[in-house]
Curated annotation (Swiss-Prot):
It is a peripheral membrane protein. Belongs to the VPS26 family. The lineage of its organism: Eukaryota, Metazoa, Chordata, Craniata, Vertebrata. Its main location: cytoplasm. It comes from Xenopus tropicalis (Western clawed frog). This is Vacuolar protein sorting-associated protein 26B.
């Protein structure tokens, strides 16, 4: 019996209708490991079958009903007692009664809205899952199955380059340029750095990709910065007039799309952090936000061709007379020790 802690009298199993053919993707779990889950997109139907397997076939099992739920949920780790549901659908599969043998029940959630990307971060988790519940007088029998949702975007209509002149008065003036301000997750960041004035001895220069996760609202806001990548641009002293190319492939890093004010609970933003280190180990940096987005597998050739042309323009050598003009210079910030 299931009485007095001998285990449930039945077990539930959830199987998707297209489980044999549906793609699986790796997704990070809360403990940092990666597991594979079925992949869904916004608007797709979620259908399958719930099977009630009796531990003692032939013995009648009384229940108060069987239901299946599709849930989209945000959990803030500092507020684990509260789960914020932004999608909640339910279907009753069986009325209260008795089951004397294992039995299966079909379900279908049609064209389900899945507005946000699945995400597991430092302080927050956004998950989608199916939950089957066989209600009983003492202990319900529950089975959950997580899925992963990816949000796809179209090519941005406006994707201007980033151009900025930064410096420290009478000591250092540099000009940096990135070919775009919005990159898809498999994109290549192409750019260049041009030294206009060098009067301090720079020994090292790099670009970092920083992910900034912001959770909470009002006085209860938490920020987590995570350096995803470090890309060495230069090891040695630059000279005036020198131009250094940048070519950073994003495909090798664990990135997500930019997420802004998701359900008014959290945001995930990405920054390119230009870091210079002088011979006295002082660090100077300048951050620039970029937008990351996920594109589908099918790429329009015309847009790919335009992207290739844009890339080629930034791979060439820069000359003072052809450099873009700027309306002003921004200050490079010195990092606090």
């Amino acid at each position: 019996m299931s009485f007095f802690g001998f285990g449930p009298a039945a077990e539930l199993d959830i199987a998707l209708t297209d489980g044999e053919s549906r793609r699986r993707v790796e997704h990070k779990t809360e403990d940092g490991k990666k597991e594979k889950y079925f992949l869904f997109y916004d608007g797709e139907t979620v259908s399958g079958r719930v099977t009630v397997n009796l531990r003692n076939p032939g013995k009648r099992l009384e229940h108060q009903g069987l239901k299946i739920e599709f849930i989209g949920q945000i959990e803030l780790y500092y507020d684990r007692g509260n789960h914020h549901e932004f999608v909640s659908l339910v279907k009753d599969l069986a009325r209260p009664g008795e089951i004397s043998q294992s039995q299966s029940f079909d379900f279908e959630f049609t064209h389900v809205e899945k507005p946000y990307e699945s995400y597991t971060g430092q302080n927050v988790k956004l998950r989608y899952f199916l939950r089957a519940t066989l209600s009983r007088r003492l202990n319900d029998v529950v089975k959950e199955m997580d899925i992963v949702v990816h949000t796809l975007s179209t090519y941005p209509e406006l994707n201007s380059s980033i151009k900025m002149e930064v410096g420290i008065e009478d000591c250092l003036h540099i000009e940096f340029e990135y070919n775009k301000s919005k990159y898809h997750l498999k994109d290549v960041i192409v750019g260049k750095i041009y030294f206009l004035l060098v009067r301090i001895k720079i020994k090292h220069m790099e670009i970092d990709i920083i992910k900034r996760e912001t959770t909470g609202t009002g006085p209860n806001v938490y920020h987590e910065n995570d350096t995803i990548a470090k890309y060495e641009i230069m090891d040695g002293a630059p000279v005036r007039g020198e131009s250094i190319p940048i070519r950073l492939f994003l495909a090798g890093y664990e990135l997500t799309p930019t997420m802004r004010d998701i359900n008014k609970k959290f945001s995930v933003r990405y920054y390119l952090n230009l870091v210079l280190i002088d011979e006295e180990e002082r660090r100077y940096f300048k951050q620039q936000e970029v937008v990351l987005w996920r594109k589908g597998d099918i790429v329009r050739k015309s847009m790919s061709h335009q992207a290739a042309i844009a890339s080629q323009r930034f791979e060439g050598t820069s000359h003072p007379e052809t450099r873009p003009q700027h309306s002003g210079a921004a200050a490079v910030e010195q990092e606090q020790e």
